[in-house]
Amino acid sequence: MKRYILTTLFALVLFAGSAFATGHIPQNDGKSEVETYIKKVAKIKSDEIDYAYISSSMFRQMFNMLGADVQSELNDIPLQLTSIRSMRQFTATGPEGYKQLSQAMDIFLQEEESVMGMKLMALNREDGTMTAIYGDSNSTLVINDEGDELNVVFIAGLSYESFKALGESGMEIGF
């Protein structure tokens, strides 16, 4: 059963930018160009909130177009890029350079108090599913384990307190 997490306008992200419709991913030769592209095709701007969403297949396709030197740079900043769906499948088939986020998942599954420098703010277990929310004053990371599917949403520029306030105001997203 799909569960909903209260937060910002996630559903609109799926329709943000022509790249989602065309599947076109431009050639990039630098980290800043990759980040610019992601922001162009997958950003919702609401006040000061930047929300980036990239599917695992799109990220893998884009990652594979980059040179080894750029892949190495991106290895240091995976969470700045993205939100990933079906993480288990992606970590099994994804590029070596995305290992850090896989390690974050391992930490999560052991229920550590922090992931990637963000503190565990909320943990909910219900009927074999688990949702954990990590955050700090700059970002929020939501990990939703449905048992057969693991969803990860990273929201850059949205503090945990703002995330919580949006939820309390009734905005919702569905994974």
Named regions from a protein language model:
Residues M1-Q27:
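Bacterial Sec-dependent N-terminal signal peptides
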Residues V41, F108-E112, G170:
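Hydrophobic, Leu/Ile/Phe/Ala-enriched alpha-helical segments that form helix-helix packing faces
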Residues G94-Q103, S139-L141, L150-N151:
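Short, surface-exposed beta-strand/loop "edge" segments at domain boundaries and coil↔beta transitions
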Residues T131-Y160:
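A short, solvent-exposed beta-edge/loop patch
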Residues S102-G135:
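Short Gly/Thr-rich strand-loop-strand
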Residues G157-F175:
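Surface-exposed amphipathic alpha-helical segments
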Residues I25-S102:
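Early exported N-terminus immediately downstream of N-terminal targeting peptides
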